[in-house]
């Protein structure tokens, strides 16, 4: 079953730990199945696993396994799909536990690797000659924001993820030389959790709602991300706080409840729900911390003086107890707690945790007032020798409050530019302006929009009835305006404009936001929320700098951006990949980023890039810190936002230690990348990279868009139709009802190729591009050695090549009814895969894929051993379905294989 392109050293310590964990969890799964289902079904699982272990499953040659699967009843197929999917999930847990152990051991050993924590990055910069003043200036501008999105690549239910988390926790308790009774107790607990997992549905019977997505994400935020942020600010406050303000350094963002692009279920109500739910999480934490401080600071004025400001604050408390009349810190904290309760009542409709009931005090009008009260306590302690009485807890609370406010995560709004155009067209018509907006050319549109921003007169009338789409847009924007009034300006992140291509695309939402008071028109327009264009296609990425220049040349852009102007721009990895292939997409994003940074710098404006990455290589996936360090020099500037979506949220942030490691590593990478000098690039290097990107673009387009048979090939050889029916997200899979590749969303596009094990978006076009561009291996080696971007591109492509299995993919090709075209197209794909693999190894000088990354190679091999049999089972079931079997149980079995393969591969979208 081993991929012949991979080489695994089974004697490595990590490899031994992975195998030991996998064997234990596999044995416990069989034990649970035997206990719950009986010997006969357990024997069926054992028989299937034995057949899989003895055959060349990875190359599609598995007659014993195929024969076994062909004889299965539909009920047995459902059962085996569950068993293999569960085995795959447990194997991942075993690998993750071994990986955390490896990370812990590596952290304990001094080394010469790049800084992986912010504190180490600061030390490295100080060692390189940076002064405290220079570091303070850097920190003042830093803004690192991972943004959680609900893109549908997480197939598992929250209940299943919670079960896996508990299994992982129990596995982490296992150590060498445990007392036998404790070892037995842990094993029994593991058995119980695995048995419960077996009886838990892997995926949802009904399509998930936006409300579910908000709740699921907040579960991870509450249990791991927020505690990790608190820990980090606790460390940073004590060790690097002297270098400047920390609060802007790390924040969280979200699209949950605010991303309307192609999503009919997102509206003003989901926006309100998201912010209210987020608020409850952070206010409860604030309240808990204030209660702890109240318990500790029973400090009497009989023994220490306090500041007049603290006495004034304490005098406002409504505590009638005579026993605390000489304890002003407690009285002040009592007041703060009551005001937090009042805030919670106002924003969420319920008091905070630990509150005894409804309070009558005034709520804080904004988070700054909460921070100000806490600062009074800090100041009094410092001035009277009591700073060490509460350690770093109070300062950490202040820093977290500055970063999270009353909203926890800033919520972005996103909508498609086409919707803005249609909405404005109706508003202009209903207002009787005589403007037929949709008929105007670009120059005329900009003129009309700029004129609308030059005065305060609205287009909207409360006495006019608008169409459904326009009414929904206005209601959502009104909800956003109310949110700013309730939570403060920090509650909204950016207004993202999908399909941005022109200056008018940036101006349109400003005119719409003006209707609800989030933009003020006049000679010097102002805005409470900033607009951010999303450049998604190769052409739009190339044209992005020109759009930015046109925007910044408008006088109104300067007043809208404010006194410290920073323009945010989002770069789309997913649609640009679907548009032009892996190499052209990555090159387009990188060159676009550099050109945007140059343009912003030339115009005297800061730039914040927002990277719309997914989990898979084809959608910009890979370790976030490495991705930051691979960004072109001069494009990070201390500021970055990156999407964290689907299955990657649980993988990167599923437990507190992992969340902390990834967030700390991301912050460190941003700091180091920001201080990297811009190199003088050899024109020959740039020319070679440009030629490769263009030629790979042409090769990719020749297959995907120019071959008339390719569209049918895609729909017939991948389980795209079955994926559309799987309830893994609230968003529709396609923007329209058509089967065109152009209309399909990037996520199901990538997801489908992953299921059939092509991984095509992560590598196709590279080899043919090299050939078309006439580049030699020596030239490519020179590129990789002198160009971090190209080295990163190759590294990620090598992972996609290792994950792809052409033997299994060939079996999916056999599903196509058009045999001649299917075999012709697949021959092209297979040749490209073989050539890309050969080039990747030749450039690096490797003997096998990933042999320079043994942990990653083992991870891929482990996933393959678990997932390959599921592919064979899926193939059997798809054959039955497409032969006309419409049994509902068969559909369930297919969807179980889809869920199992996705969960096993872990970066499918």
Swiss-Prot record:
Active-site annotation: 151, 578
GO molecular function terms noted in the UniProt entry: magnesium ion binding; phosphoenolpyruvate carboxylase activity
Pfam family, one: PEPcase
A single Gene Ontology CC term: cytosol
Keywords, ordered alphabetically: Carbon dioxide fixation, Lyase, Magnesium
Reactions this protein catalyses: oxaloacetate + phosphate = phosphoenolpyruvate + hydrogencarbonate
Keyword Nuclease: no
InterPro entries registered for this protein in UniProt: PEP_COase, PEP_COase_bac/pln-type, PEP_COase_Lys_AS, PEPCASE_His_AS, Pyrv/PenolPyrv_kinase-like_dom
Function: Forms oxaloacetate, a four-carbon dicarboxylic acid source for the tricarboxylic acid cycle.
Name recorded for this polypeptide: Phosphoenolpyruvate carboxylase
Organism, as annotated: Caulobacter vibrioides (strain ATCC 19089 / CIP 103742 / CB 15)
